[in-house]
Amino acid sequence: MAARLIAKIVFTSGTVLVRSIQMAYKQALLQAESGMGAAAGSMDVKSKMSPIEARKILGLENVETVSKEDIDKKYNELLTINDPKDGGSEYLQIKISGAKHCLHSALKEGKKI
């Protein structure tokens, strides 16, 4: 009787474990197909990045007045350097894109950056 109960518990636990692994694998595949890696999936689009941090990321902290052209030039330059196909980092590309969007938004709102 006890052996039967233990076998039932082990079988049920194993089934639950296998199903949870399958679901996690399916989610990982969906994220990979949509181009959202772990870093992209965990980043909130509306996460707050200060213009000061964004300037540092793009290497524009020593520039007195930042123009849209300055932002775009540094963005393209850094994105090319950090291309994952050439050994770059997808995480850094996400940070660079976030910095660009932050500074563009600040310029659009008329904030001094």
Curated annotation (Swiss-Prot):
<keyword id="KW-0999">Mitochondrion inner membrane</keyword>
<comment type="similarity">
    <text>Belongs to the TIM16/PAM16 family.</text>
</comment>
<protein>
    <recommendedName>
        <fullName>Mitochondrial import inner membrane translocase subunit tim16</fullName>
    </recommendedName>
</protein>
<keyword id="KW-0653">Protein transport</keyword>
<dbReference type="Pfam" id="PF03656">
    <property type="entry name" value="Pam16"/>
</dbReference>
<dbReference type="InterPro" id="IPR005341">
    <property type="entry name" value="Tim16"/>
</dbReference>
<feature type="region of interest" description="J-like">
    <location>
        <begin position="56"/>
        <end position="108"/>
    </location>
</feature>
<keyword id="KW-0496">Mitochondrion</keyword>
<comment type="subunit">
    <text>Probable component of the PAM complex at least composed of a mitochondrial HSP70 protein, grepE, tim16 and tim14. Associates with the TIM23 complex.</text>
</comment>
<comment type="function">
    <text>Regulates ATP-dependent protein translocation into the mitochondrial matrix.</text>
</comment>
<keyword id="KW-0811">Translocation</keyword>
<dbReference type="GO" id="GO:0005744">
    <property type="term" value="C:TIM23 mitochondrial import inner membrane translocase complex"/>
</dbReference>
<keyword id="KW-0813">Transport</keyword>
<keyword id="KW-0472">Membrane</keyword>
<dbReference type="InterPro" id="IPR036869">
    <property type="entry name" value="J_dom_sf"/>
</dbReference>
<dbReference type="GO" id="GO:0030150">
    <property type="term" value="P:protein import into mitochondrial matrix"/>
</dbReference>
